[in-house]
Amino acid sequence: MGRFPEAEERLLNKKICMRCNARNAIRATRCRKCGYSALRVKSKESKGA
């Protein structure tokens, strides 16, 4: 993507809550804001065209 590898790791190595879209740690099992357990890994590719 053109960023430094350290920045890529910090920005993209996250989990996203499917209910409230909060960013969570990669090792999280529940959302830190709402407690929901359905977390997805953040997309590594941008959605833009």
Swiss-Prot record:
Ranges that cross the membrane: none
Gene Ontology molecular function: any one: structural constituent of ribosome
SMART domains found in the cross-reference section: Ribosomal_L40e (SM01377)
Keyword set, alphabetical order: Ribonucleoprotein, Ribosomal protein
GO cellular component: ribonucleoprotein complex; ribosome
Family under the similarity heading: Belongs to the eukaryotic ribosomal protein eL40 family.
PANTHER family recorded: 50S RIBOSOMAL PROTEIN L40E, LARGE RIBOSOMAL SUBUNIT PROTEIN EL40
The protein, known as: Large ribosomal subunit protein eL40
Native organism taxonomy: Archaea, Methanobacteriati, Methanobacteriota, Stenosarchaea group, Methanomicrobia
Gene name, Swiss-Prot/TrEMBL: rpl40e
